[in-house]
């Protein structure tokens, strides 16, 4: 429930909905994460509350999960549309890191966690792959020259490895060589995949993406939530 203060942020002087406050907050975040998050070795730093990079100790590895670089690409593709200076550099570095560090050139797919020295966690997670698709779609929307390569690759991986047509949803997790790690299914990864599929449809107009998004919505909402008095189950098999 919104209070009066929140409502005033989200409305203009006439009381009509406004994006001005949201745009201001987005700009603050772009400025906060901007160049400070760029790791000179590749990928991105996590930042502390003051905006300084949280560099690991000398002996620690700089672990970078897949959803880190992919989210940076997505967010700074939006920043590019805002005209934010330096957004292209963030997108460049993110796409290069995803392709060169996270991508498994031998077995296909994308490792869950890596450092600049190699693979930390070789698992192939649906959650992370959903964000690869989102990053590729966002980069394509701003016409980045590396977007199509990533988009073509991740679409093939999702179609061949993750998608279960008989269920209308994604499998959850695999080993590096695509051995299933569990029978678990989750709403969270499928929710993020739905977002990414809609984004991919928006930039390609390929109805295959929209059809998959609708199938997930049918499973999670029309079947699971309906049978649970419209509560959305998080975990299922």
Regions inferred by a protein language model and the residue ranges of each:
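Glycan-recognition and catalytic cores of secretory/periplasmic carbohydrate-active enzymes
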Residues: 1-237
């Amino acid at each position: 429930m919104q209070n009066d203060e929140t409502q005033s942020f989200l409305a203009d002087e006439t009381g009509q909905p406004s994006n001005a406050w949201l745009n201001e907050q987005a700009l603050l975040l772009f400025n906060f994460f901007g160049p400070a998050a760029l790791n000179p070795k590749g990928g991105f730093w996590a930042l502390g509350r003051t905006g300084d990079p949280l560099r690991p100790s000398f002996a620690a590895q700089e672990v970078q999960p897949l959803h880190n670089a992919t989210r940076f690409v997505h967010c700074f593709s939006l920043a590019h549309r805002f005209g934010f200076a330096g957004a292209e550099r963030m997108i460049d570095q993110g796409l290069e890191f995803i392709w060169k560090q996270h991508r498994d050139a031998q077995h296909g797919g994308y490792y869950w966690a890596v450092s600049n020295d190699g693979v930390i966690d070789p698992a192939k997670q649906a959650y992370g792959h959903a964000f690869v698709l989102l990053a590729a779609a966002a980069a394509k929307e701003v016409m980045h020259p590396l977007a199509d390569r990533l988009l073509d690759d991740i679409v093939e991986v999702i179609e061949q490895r993750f998608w279960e047509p008989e269920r209308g949803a994604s499998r959850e997790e695999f080993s590096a060589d695509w051995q299933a790690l569990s029978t678990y299914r989750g709403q969270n990864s499928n929710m993020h995949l739905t977002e990414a599929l809609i984004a991919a449809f928006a930039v390609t107009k390929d109805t295959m993406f929209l059809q998959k998004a609708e199938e997930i919505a049918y499973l999670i909402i029309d079947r699971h939530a309906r049978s649970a008095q419209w509560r959305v189950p998080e975990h299922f098999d």
